[in-house]
């Protein structure tokens, strides 16, 4: 199952790199993870993002895909929608450049958890973010 992590980002390439590295280090089946980022084309750090994309494609080449999409300034939700249209994942995970994945083998744990939805194939799930608990689905995972 391919997991696409969709992340709008603005003016925080260092956070973005930390996020990519954390996902990479915590992932078991890297070939099943795609990371897509949306960057506004007026972002003051656009050159740093372009450099990060080149660097990330080499350093994290085990990932299925790593890509930065540059476009018109827009809201986070519209950026997520644009990234969703371009991704190849079976599962879409909403990301944020200030996240840090800490759970080892999160991808395999997610596979096990999502098996319960095999028949329905329509669901929303989320990981415990350490802040909202069960009160709020901060970064949804959708089919």
Question: Locations of the language-model features?
Answer:
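Acidic donor-binding segment of Leloir-type glycosyltransferases
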Residues: 23-69
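Active-site nucleotide-sugar/metal-binding loop of Leloir-type enzymes
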Residues: 81-91
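Cell-envelope/extracellular polymer assembly enzymes that use nucleotide-activated donors
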Residues: 2-4, 34
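Short, acidic/glycine-rich phosphate-metal binding loop used to engage nucleotide
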Residues: 11, 68-76, 130-131
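Short beta-strand-to-loop acidic/aromatic patch adjacent to the donor-nucleotide binding site
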Residues: 89-100
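Short, well-formed alpha-helical segments that are part of the catalytic scaffolds
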Residues: 12-27
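Short beta-strand-to-loop element that shapes/binds the nucleotide-sugar donor at the catalytic cleft/hinge
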Residues: 121-138
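Conserved donor-nucleotide/metal-binding helix-loop-beta segment in metal-dependent transferases, i.e.
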Residues: 104-124
């Amino acid at each position: 199952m391919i997991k696409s992590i969709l992340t709008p980002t603005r003016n925080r390439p260092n956070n973005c790199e930390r996020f990519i590295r954390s996902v990479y280090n915590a992932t078991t089946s890297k070939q099943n993870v795609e990371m897509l980022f949306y960057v506004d084309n007026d972002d003051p750090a656009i050159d740093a993002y372009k450099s990060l994309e080149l660097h990330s494609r080499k350093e994290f080449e085990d990932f299925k895909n790593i890509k930065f999409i540059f476009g018109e300034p827009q809201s986070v939700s519209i950026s997520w929608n644009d990234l969703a249209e371009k991704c190849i994942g079976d599962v879409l995970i909403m990301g944020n450049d200030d996240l840090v994945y800490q759970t080892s083998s999160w991808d395999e744990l997610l596979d096990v958890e999502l098996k319960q939805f095999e028949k329905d194939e329509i669901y929303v799930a989320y990981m415990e973010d350490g802040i909202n608990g069960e009160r709020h689905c901060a970064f949804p995972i959708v089919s």
